[in-house]
Amino acid sequence: MAGHSQFKNIMHRKGRQDAMKSKLFGKLAREITVAAKLGTPDPAMNPRLRAAVVAARAENMPKDNIERAIKKALGGEGENYAEIRYEGYGPGGVAVIVEALTDNRNRAASDIRSFFTKSGGNLGETGSVSFMFDRVGIIEFDRSVASDDSVLDAAIEAGADDVISGEGGHEVYASPDSFHEVAKNLEAKFGEPRKAALTWKPQNTVAVDDETGEKLVKLMDLLNEHDDVQNVYANFEISDALMAKMGG
C-alpha cells in the first residue's frame, strides 16, 4: 500500500496569505451551509458537513463562524447554490478541474472561462479532463499521531486503499464509497484529522518548465481568488525553487 507521493495539491496555495483568510472563511462557511442544508445540521450524522467542519477547523476558523454557517442552513439559506465542476486545459496542456458553489451560473462560467483564456488555456466540456484523475477520499494526520507502521495497520484495518507517510504527515486514501467510514474509524483511533475530504488525485503528473509554471500558478491564483470557486486541482509539478519564488 505504501508508495511515493507525487500528489502536490496546488489548491493549498489559497490559504497561504493572511489577506486571503477572510475570503477563505467565506468559502468554508458556504460549504458548511450547503452541506447542512443538503443533510442534517448535525456533523456527527452528516459526513459532508463533518468534512466541512474539519476543513474549517484546520484553517483556524472561529467556532462562532462555523455555528453561524450551520444556522444559516436552518434559516433557509444555501438553497440557491449550485454545485458545478468545470474542466479544461491550462498553459502547457495541463489538466485542470475547478469545483464551484455558485448562485449565478452564468457569472461563474463567464469568469472561469475568461481566466482560462487569458492564461493561454481553454475551458472544456464536463469530462474532458477528469478521466485523468481519480476521485478519492483523503484523510490527513500530523506526523506525531503515530508511527508509520501503526497508521498503516490502522488504515488497512479500516479499509483504506493507500497510505503515504512522510515528513509532512500521514496521507490515507480511500474510495469515495468507503471514505467516510474509514475516516470515522481512524478518527476514533488517532483523533480528529487535519483534513478529511473527497478530492481529485492526478493519475500522473506533468513536469513543466519555469515559464509555463509561472503561468499555471497565476491561473491557480486567479481561480482560487474567485468567490465561487471552492477547490482547484491540476496535474502538474513545478520545481521547489519556482514555488518558493511564487510565494507558495
UniProtKB/Swiss-Prot annotation:
Annotated family: Belongs to the TACO1 family.
Compartments where located: Cytoplasm
Record's protein name:
Probable transcriptional regulatory protein BRADO1143
Residues annotated as signal peptide: none
Q: Which GO terms describe its molecular function?
A: DNA binding
Q: What does the record list as GO biological process?
A: regulation of DNA-templated transcription
Short name of any one Pfam family annotated for the protein: Transcrip_reg
**UniProt keyword DNA-binding, yes or no:** yes
State the organism of origin. Bradyrhizobium sp. (strain ORS 278)
Gene3D superfamilies in alphabetical order = 1.10.10.200, 3.30.70.980
Cysteine disulfide links: none
Q: Which SUPFAM superfamilies match?
A: YebC-like
What lineage is this protein's organism placed in? Bacteria, Pseudomonadati, Pseudomonadota, Alphaproteobacteria, Hyphomicrobiales
Domain of life where this protein originates: Bacteria
Entry GO terms, CC: cytosol
Alphabetized, the UniProt keywords read: Cytoplasm, DNA-binding, Transcription, Transcription regulation
